[in-house]
A protein has these predicted regions:
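Catalytic cores of the polymerase beta-like nucleotidyltransferase superfamily
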Residues: 2-260
Length: 260
């Protein structure tokens, strides 16, 4: 576990400020009262470390879905059970996911097994997205070296890269998106897995389109992002009807890619 006091020296992480919304703080108080843990996880923690102001907050807990519902009900909070079978309950407009292992492939697992934080982190895609902020103790829990990877702008999967990508092939495009957004590099195993199997088979056209648009918008250098995507074999899958020489595209003309 990495305590915030270790992040305070004047370096690129000294600006860490995770400004948690008041409604989430209230939810946290209810969980703490019931002796259950509540963590902020993923993108919000990553962005705060980078000095950005997070817009979305994903929450994770050791409480089972029925326990989450009971805590919320006793606290007078509105709940939605739309993802209960997958370990996700919406409380006060915020998704709260129980620590779990996903059984099956794809965006929606066939079933889940509940676990602890060590088990939960193994199902996540990239190390930089597998950071937890413990609201009880004011500490970042980093079990996979995500902070060091952020420091190096290194994009690396959690565990075996081929297995993570096989679970959901869209993760391949996500890895490339974060590489482009950070202006960083792919980890060796992660890059090798992408080169060996860039296939996006089984992923809907809509998900591919949305991820591609997001990648284009967030890339620090659009041309370099497109060059790498082409080199790894993604553009011919994303835009199969277009015969375009990627290296000669002006990065300001990427809108042409979105009209498909």
């Amino acid at each position: 576990m990495i305590y915030l006091s270790n992040l305070i020296p004047l370096n690129e992480y000294s600006k860490f400020r995770l400004n948690i919304p008041s409604d989430i703080k209230n939810i946290h108080k209810l969980f703490k009262k019931n002796k259950k843990k509540l963590f902020v996880v993923g993108g919000a923690v990553r962005d705060a470390i980078l000095g950005k102001n997070p817009k979305d907050f994903d929450l994770a807990t050791d409480a089972k879905p029925d326990e989450v519902l009971k805590i919320a009900k006793n606290g007078g909070l509105k709940t939605v059970e739309v993802g209960k079978q997958f370990g996700v309950v919406i409380v006060g407009g915020h998704e709260i996911a129980t620590f779990r292992k996903d059984i099956g492939k794809g965006r929606r697992p066939s079933s889940v097994d509940y676990t602890d934080i060590e088990g939960d982190v193994k199902r996540r895609d990239l190390t930089i997205n597998a950071l937890f902020y413990d609201m009880d103790r004011g500490e970042i829990v980093d079990l996979v070296g995500g902070i060091e990877d952020l420091k190096k702008k290194k994009i690396r999967t959690v565990g075996n890269a081929a297995e993570r990508f096989d679970e959901d092939p869209l993760r391949k495009m996500r890895a490339l998106r974060f590489q482009g957004a950070l202006g960083g590099k792919l980890g060796r195993e992660t890059e090798n897995a992408l080169r060996q199997n860039p296939s996006l088979d089984g992923v809907s056209k809509e998900r591919i389109r949305d991820e591609f648009v997001k990648s284009i918008k967030k890339a620090k250098n659009t041309k370099k992002y497109l060059q790498l995507a082409d080199e790894l074999g993604f553009t011919k899958q994303i835009l199969p009807r277009y015969q375009i020489s990627i290296p000669y595209i002006n990065e300001n003309d990427y809108i042409l890619f979105l009209a498909w």
